[in-house]
Amino acid sequence: MTKQSIRAREFKRIILAKKFFAKRIKLKQIISNIHSSSEERWNAIIKLQQLPRDSSRSRQRNRCSQTGRPHAFLRKFGLSRIKVREAAMRGEIPGLRKASW
């Protein structure tokens, strides 16, 4: 199991990303707009850099919902490969069975 502090940190990152999502999009549009002046771009870049680091979506880590494991995460199930295999062997995932050819 993952430590509670790490889970809390991930939860904080999710909340911050939602909070600053619209602001980040607006600033990125100003930066990428070819019609905006260089001064507007620089101001937008500085404002973007002043936002909290954890408000960026790329700082979030996908984790297994049961164990909190960060590696070998399968998005389709929201679980790590180990827990998907265990659930599949018990027949808890409909339509999923062991491959044989």
Swiss-Prot record:
Q: Could you give a single Gene Ontology term from the biological process aspect?
A: translation
Q: Which UniProt keywords apply?
A: Ribonucleoprotein, Ribosomal protein, RNA-binding, rRNA-binding
- A family per Pfam: Ribosomal_S14
Q: Which domain of life is it from?
A: Bacteria
Instruction: Tell me which Gene3D superfamilies the record gives.
Output: 1.10.287.1480
Q: Name one GO cellular component term.
A: cytoplasm
Give the PROSITE patterns listed for this entry: RIBOSOMAL_S14
Q: What InterPro entries does the record point to? A: Ribosomal_uS14 (IPR001209), Ribosomal_uS14_bac/plastid (IPR023036), Ribosomal_uS14_CS (IPR018271)
The molecular function terms of the Gene Ontology recorded here are: rRNA binding; structural constituent of ribosome
Record family assignment:
Belongs to the universal ribosomal protein uS14 family.
General function of this protein: Binds 16S rRNA, required for the assembly of 30S particles and may also be responsible for determining the conformation of the 16S rRNA at the A site.
**Description of how the protein assembles with itself and partners:** Part of the 30S ribosomal subunit. Contacts proteins S3 and S10.
The protein's name is: Small ribosomal subunit protein uS14
Please give the organism.
Baumannia cicadellinicola subsp. Homalodisca coagulata
Lineage of the species this protein comes from: Bacteria, Pseudomonadati, Pseudomonadota, Gammaproteobacteria, Candidatus Palibaumannia
